[in-house]
Amino acid sequence: MRQLAHFKFFDTLSKKMVAGFIILILIGTVLLSLPWATPANVHTSLIDVLFTSASATCITGLTVVNTAAHWTTFGQLVILVLSEVGALGYMTFAVLLFNIMRRQIGLSTQLMVKASLNLERLSDTKSVMKYVVGLSLLFQLGGLGLLAIDFVPRFGWRHGLYVSLYHAVMSFCNAGFDVFGDSLQGFRNDPYVLTVTMILIIAGGLGFLVWRDVLLYHTRKRLTLNSKLTLLTTFSLFVIGFVLLLITERDLELLPTGMPWVNRTINTLFLSVTPRTAGLITMPTQGLQAGSLLVIMILMFVGGTPGSTAGGIKTTTFGVLMFQSIAQLRGRRDVEFSHRRFSQENINRALMLIFLASIVLTVATLILTQTEKIPKGFGLEYVLFEVLSAFGTVGLSLGLTPNLTLIGKIVIMMLMFIGRVGIFTSLYALSRRQARVNLIRYPAENILIG
């Protein structure tokens, strides 16, 4: 393994991170190809095994086969472990293993952890790692205990604890896999389970750095600009999404008649939370109104927070662009928030990220419209919904994924990978040369815009 670092492909952190996720996907593919991963006489094609492994590693949850019916307990546990490692980052577990073995962590390893968790300083690596592992255990074990209160009486001790563990991990990791067969549609009348699930989804999608900042607030008496922007954007999107879905799905015809208004409200709130890369659902997406699908697609595009278990363009990117637009409308030169000014580099990266994401999504949508069959009653949204779900590592589907062609599966896998690793990291990994400083700076000239 040490000799691999001398290969040209592994000469940058971006390439090492991309290679690490690819290796993890391949390991998952091998494990899911084993005979005891599926019931006897059940055949799974190589592309479907690879797709499942990629979906789990990229914590998406899009499936070409039913997780509950197609995979054995061993296969389901492989998916669970892949989702856990994919959510927290394989470097997190590598460092944890080094600590258990009492081995010194090298500089290159610390740099990869710093890059994978979006840390500002290398000195923060060890302290943040403790919070990542500690918070993950706290939320997932806490979720296991809370869900067991409902699931154990319902399913019995053995299966109840297994289901509680699986659902707690998948909810916190925002993976979207389930062992119920129909996601959470059987729990639409159970506000307790839905509330616990929403808490886990929000906790996982908020980001470890934000949680660390919040927990240290009692000593620092302040939050970083990143945490403030994240909390504001996250809360705003939840509220706006909830209100818009209340309007677009005001009749909630997909829910049983006579359902108490409290349960109907919680189902709508859950519908606004799950597009933030969770992928769990309490009602069939195919029956949602066109306006609801649009709201969900926007939420999937934004996604969660950098350094979290979520995908998408991230809440901070969305927040920076919103404040940049407000500053332009007010005629202000600087983009300000909470008595601080966003650097021009942040603004440029946000604009570039939106631009690149738009190109990737447009190309993917165009390809799928040519390779996939759109059923009657649907239009472009049938493909676009799946594309955004893959890019945002969400896992919601209008029914396209199980019927994808070979080319379609490859496209969706690439989108899931880019959504998890990040556009910038993916591009840097493909780049053959390092960025160079331009010694020549030409005169500026205005052009007509808009």
Question: What kind of region is each of these model predictions?
Answer:
Residues 1-450:
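Membrane-proximal intracellular helices of multi-pass ion channels
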